[in-house]
Each structure stands twice: as structure tokens, then as C-alpha cells.
């Protein structure tokens, strides 16, 4: 691992990053405002491992180009990432309060896409979360649902897409099979078939996912 790229400063996205950087002398990349917001939680990071990224600007690590794009979330300066290697493109888009034109444009023509499918709306509404937390998740800077993820995929799908990974699933307000079936049904209704040239899998919370080659 040559670098860590941080999307935003929430603790579930930075936990362990500081320890990893110190132990293996690995740089941490984030937007300037994100760095300011997370620096106390990371602990001491040597200056040469404090690195910045800028929205829509390329950051080159060896033979890989990383380009952040803006996302709406309740953080100071959150981003998703596009990762380019040769003609191949991998997109990472989680913690999306809602879908913007920037997100649509950024994840179009990806070979591999990791997309948030955070919750089932009925499970969330009927679940045990307090009202203010439900409102935060459902709000413009919260998280997108299985249905929203499916509709976005149907909208931006191209023949270049090979793998979809659904990620950032809520433990309490979603199930992997429910997220998969909801998204698969929306794609099928849009005449997009899974299982041949296009595959979809879940990004597991506590274990490694499938290894894919493009």
C-alpha cells in the first residue's frame, strides 16, 4: 500500500489511518478542510505524510492517477474518488446525501464502481433509530437508499461497466440480500442484465471482498 486516500473525516472512515501511516510510513491524502477536521483524531503524522488532494485535479501515485470529486454529505469537504490506470477506471462513491450532476458525470464510464446502498427506506423508517438520526440519514447530506442506488446505476450504465460493488450498508437498516435484490430488480426493469459481462457483488463490512481483474 503506497498511500491512503480519505473521503471525509467521520470516524468510521479514518479509524486506524493514523496508526497505519505511522507504522508503515505511508502518506495520507485528503482535502485541506478534511485534514484540518481529522488531524486531532489521527494523532501525530509526520509532515511528509500529510498530503492534500483537490477536487477535479489529478494526483499521481506511481502509475495510478487519482481524481477526487465533490459529494454532498454532512462533513466539511467530502469527496469520492476516480482511480485511473491506463484505460481502466475505478470509481468510489459512498456517503452520498443525494445524487448530483457531478456524481453522475464522475462515475459514468467506470469499469468498476463501488456505490453506496446504505439503507432500505422502510427498514429505516420503522427501525429503532431516534427521529433526528433518521432525518439525518434521509436528508440531503445523509446517505442514499437501495432504490436510489439502483436508479442511479440504471441512469449511468454503459457497456464499459464490468463490476458493481454495493457498499456502506447499514447493519440495522439494510440486509445484503435486500440491497442486491432491490438494485437487481431496478436494473432488470431497465433491461440491464447481471451475470454475464456485468457482475454485481456486495462490499462486506468485516471481510475482504472478491478480487477482480480488468
Question: Where are the language model's segments positioned?
Answer:
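Cap/insert and terminal regions of metallo-dependent hydrolase folds
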Residues: 101-201
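Metallo-beta-lactamase
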Residues: 32-87
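Divalent metal-coordination and catalytic microenvironments
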Residues: 8, 28, 66, 73, ...
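Structural motif
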Residues: 2-3, 88-90, 112, 163
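Active-site environment of divalent metal-dependent phosphoester hydrolases
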Residues: 10-14, 35-38, 75-76, 98-101, ...
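Active-site metal-binding motif and surrounding structural segment of the metallo-beta-lactamase
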Residues: 1-31
Amino acid at each position: 500500500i503506497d498511500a491512503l486516500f480519505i473521503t471525509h473525516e467521520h470516524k468510521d472512515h479514518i479509524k486506524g489511518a493514523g496508526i497505519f501511516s505511522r507504522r508503515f510510513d505511508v502518506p495520507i491524502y485528503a482535502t485541506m478542510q478534511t485534514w484540518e477536521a481529522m488531524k486531532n483524531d489521527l494523532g501525530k503524522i509526520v509532515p511528509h505524510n500529510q498530503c492534500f488532494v483537490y477536487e477535479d485535479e489529478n494526483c499521481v501515485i506511481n502509475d495510478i492517477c487519482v481524481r477526487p470529486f465533490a459529494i454532498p454529505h454532512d462533513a466539511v469537504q467530502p469527496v469520492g474518488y476516480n482511480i485511473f490506470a491506463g484505460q481502466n477506471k475505478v470509481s468510489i462513491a459512498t456517503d452520498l446525501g443525494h445524487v448530483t450532476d457531478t456524481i453522475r458525470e464522475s462515475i459514468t464510464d467506470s469499469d468498476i464502481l463501488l456505490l453506496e446502498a446504505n439503507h432500505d427506506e422502510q427498514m429505516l423508517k420503522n427501525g429503532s433509530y431516534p427521529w433526528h438520526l433518521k432525518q439525518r440519514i434521509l436528508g440531503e447530506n445523509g446517505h442514499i437508499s437501495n432504490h436510489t442506488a439502483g436508479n442511479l446505476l440504471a441512469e449511468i450504465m454503459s457497456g464499459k461497466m464490468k463490476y458493481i460493488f454495493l457498499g456502506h450498508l447499514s447493519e440495522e437498516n439494510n440486509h445484503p440480500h435486500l440491497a442486491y435484490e432491490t438494485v437487481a430488480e431496478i436494473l432488470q426493469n431497465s433491461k440491464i442484465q447481471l451475470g454475464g459481462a456485468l457482475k454485481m457483488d456486495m462490499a462486506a463490512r468485516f471481510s475482504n471482498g472478491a478480487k477482480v481483474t480488468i
